[in-house]
């Protein structure tokens, strides 16, 4: 209000994100052409409006744009994917109590366009509680038990809460749905099942599910990287090197909300360096430690490992 914004208030009881967004959408005049939906913790990079007006035409219903969901201290993206909350004013409504999505209701086929020119950055409040998400996700699955996306989200949320058995049961249900056909998401469900088994110390079942995840999406680094983490925890250093090498063969980094930072940061190089050290191959260890240090030059432990390895090799020679 202090900035001159015309603020409208409405109580949504019980709280649902879809209902709140639909009430917000009703406030947009019917003669507007384009709606750009952002949250208070999201900031569009400068020049977005001019770019949008250049890209948009009357045939487009929805625009996909780059969404940097997570950024590092230098404001460089860690996890990026395409979001789709720029849309035409008419023929849309929000659905699902949480992790709400825009549902197209138009009489003709929805026309989509993708751009990398418009970028939205996410700066979340880390102190904000997520406690409302779980009951809303449970409600969402109850309302639409055949929706694969929300079944996946619910299983993932159980994992966040350390409810390992609930996570496993829910994600197996996700994989059994006829609509659950997106291999990347299926792979993520399998990884999360494996992660739950790992936390239950049922390591062979964790390995089995990671094998399934690799078969499901062999083009993704994530299942290999997850296997690296497991084998490292179990001190199976030869296996760390085996799966780490396979992970590093995959160069493509697709934009997806299921990207795991540990798949593309220094983690794999670091664990391979330590594994080579444990197996007595100091030269290889140094090689991978250098690569880890190149990605994260401020990591003191990796810096110290570099000095130790260089001294060991020097003494050996």
Positions of predicted regions on the chain:
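Active-site nucleotide-sugar/metal-binding loop of Leloir-type enzymes
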Residues: 22-34
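Acidic donor-binding segment of Leloir-type glycosyltransferases
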Residues: 1-14, 23, 242-249
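Catalytic-site signature of metal-activated, phosphate-bearing donor transferases
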Residues: 19-25, 43-169, 173
């Amino acid at each position: 209000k202090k900035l001159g914004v015309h603020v409208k208030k409405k109580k949504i009881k019980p709280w649902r994100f879809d209902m709140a967004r639909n009430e917000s959408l009703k406030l947009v005049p019917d003669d507007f052409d384009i709606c750009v939906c952002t949250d208070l913790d999201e900031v569009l990079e400068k020049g977005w409006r001019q770019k949008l007006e250049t890209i948009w035409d009357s045939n487009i219903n929805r625009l996909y744009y780059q969404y940097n969901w997570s950024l590092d201290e230098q404001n460089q993206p860690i996890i990026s994917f395409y979001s789709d909350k720029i849309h035409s004013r008419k023929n849309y409504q929000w659905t699902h109590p949480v992790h709400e999505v825009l549902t197209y209701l138009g009489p003709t086929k929805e026309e989509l366009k993708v751009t990398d020119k418009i970028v939205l950055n996410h700066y979340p409040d880390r102190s904000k509680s997520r406690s409302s998400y779980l009951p809303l996700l449970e409600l969402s699955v109850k309302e639409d038990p055949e929706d694969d996306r929300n079944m996946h989200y619910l299983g993932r949320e159980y994992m966040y809460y350390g409810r390992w058995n609930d996570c496993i049961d829910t994600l197996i249900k996700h994989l059994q749905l006829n609509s659950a056909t997106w291999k990347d998401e299926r792979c993520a469900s399998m990884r999360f099942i494996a992660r739950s088994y790992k936390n239950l110390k049922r390591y062979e079942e964790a390995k089995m599910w990671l094998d399934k995840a690799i078969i499901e999406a062999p083009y993704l680094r994530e299942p290999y990287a997850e296997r690296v983490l497991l084998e490292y925890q179990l001190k199976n250093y030869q296996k760390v090197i085996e799966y780490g090498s396979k992970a590093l063969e995959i160069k493509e980094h697709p934009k997806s909300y299921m990207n795991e930072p540990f798949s593309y940061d220094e983690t794999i190089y670091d664990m391979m360096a330590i594994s080579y050290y444990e197996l007595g191959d100091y030269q290889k260890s140094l090689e991978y430690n250098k690569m880890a240090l190149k990605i994260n030059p401020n990591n003191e432990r990796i810096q110290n490992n570099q000095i130790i390895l260089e001294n060991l090799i020097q003494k050996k020679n």
